[in-house]
């Protein structure tokens, strides 16, 4: 019935899988950004800014390259992709940020 009207059905399992994959990519890249912040010696708001910029950069790359600009095909509400899980990668980021900062700058 939905296909007759030209509307693609939304399958909940597919949307949940897409969210899981995006969450995995963001968590993995947040660790890499944490390593970069630690090696660069960023502290305080500079490190926080790198996390936020990195989060949105990775989100934009996923949106542009993998989704080809068609967000509604993979997610129901559009805002959820951009800001809903911004804090999920923060623990990984902070852990690797402090680890690499202490490894590089321990003798200063």
From Swiss-Prot:
Transmembrane regions listed in the UniProt entry: 21-41, 45-65, 86-106
Keyword field contains Heme: no
GO term, biological process aspect, one: autophagosome assembly
Entry's localization field: Endoplasmic reticulum membrane
Major location (coarse): endoplasmic reticulum
Keywords attached to this entry: Endoplasmic reticulum, Membrane, Transmembrane, Transmembrane helix
Pfam families noted in UniProt: EMC6
Membrane topology: Multi-pass membrane protein
GO CC, alphabetical: EMC complex; endoplasmic reticulum
Membership in a protein family: Belongs to the EMC6 family.
Protein name, entry field: ER membrane protein complex subunit 6
Organism: Schizosaccharomyces pombe (strain 972 / ATCC 24843) (Fission yeast)
């Amino acid at each position: 019935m939905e296909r007759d009207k030209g509307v693609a059905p939304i399958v909940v399992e597919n949307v949940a899988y897409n969210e899981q994959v995006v969450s995995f990519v963001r968590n993995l890249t947040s660790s890499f950004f944490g390593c970069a912040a630690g090696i660069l010696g960023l502290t305080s708001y500079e490190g926080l800014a790198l996390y936020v910029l990195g989060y949105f950069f990775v989100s934009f790359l996923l949106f542009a390259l993998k989704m080809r600009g068609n967000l509604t095909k993979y997610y129901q509400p559009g805002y959820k992709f951009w800001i809903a899980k911004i804090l999920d990668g923060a623990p990984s980021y902070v852990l690797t940020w402090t680890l690499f900062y202490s490894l590089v700058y321990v003798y200063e």
